[in-house]
Amino acid sequence: MVDFGGWEMPLQYENGILKEHLGTRRYGGLFDVSHMGRFRIHGRDKIAFLQHVLSNDAESLNPWQAQYTLIPNNNGGLLDDAYLFRTGDEYFLVVNASNREKDWNHLHSHASSFDVSLEEQTENISMIAFQGPLTESILVKLLEGGSMPETSRNRLSEIMLAGTKIISARTGYTGEPLGFELFIPSEKVEDVWNCLYKAGSDEGILSVGLGARD
């Protein structure tokens, strides 16, 4: 275990970094990425606020879509990169763990000029990245309700898995053409992880640590 952005993270699991890397490319990998910061944004001026604090065009984002974006600082430099997700009328922003407090303070400093509310959801909502060629077929097999996201990258949907309502997004940082990030109530994340691992381990799915992810 190593410290990363104030979180204890597994550098690797029992298979080691190389096998975790190759396993993700060939079959699929399970990554606990709950250390990433998650902020919920809502309120009448949410779009105007997001247009003000982010570099990408948040207004162009349709429901159940996501986009990569940057958080500029007050001088036009870079504070952090982030991912913005839209479900229905709500938005949530995923930021880097090491910048979470700094990003939160920066966003709050601008929120007072808008009719908008920010909620810190990092501890309430956990994240699993499920990345690699076999991931979609495994998810489809386990699906208990809802439907998978549209096939284009950056699409979202709501699914039921392991008795839990989950937001599934076709996003991820591994470079794999097929992969998902799953947003899960924290009290249910262990159940979902175990369900995915049990279903995928016979097909080569591995738990993957920070070393292989980097």
Residue ranges of model-derived segments:
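Glycine/proline-enriched, intrinsically flexible loops and inter-domain linkers
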Residues: 1-214
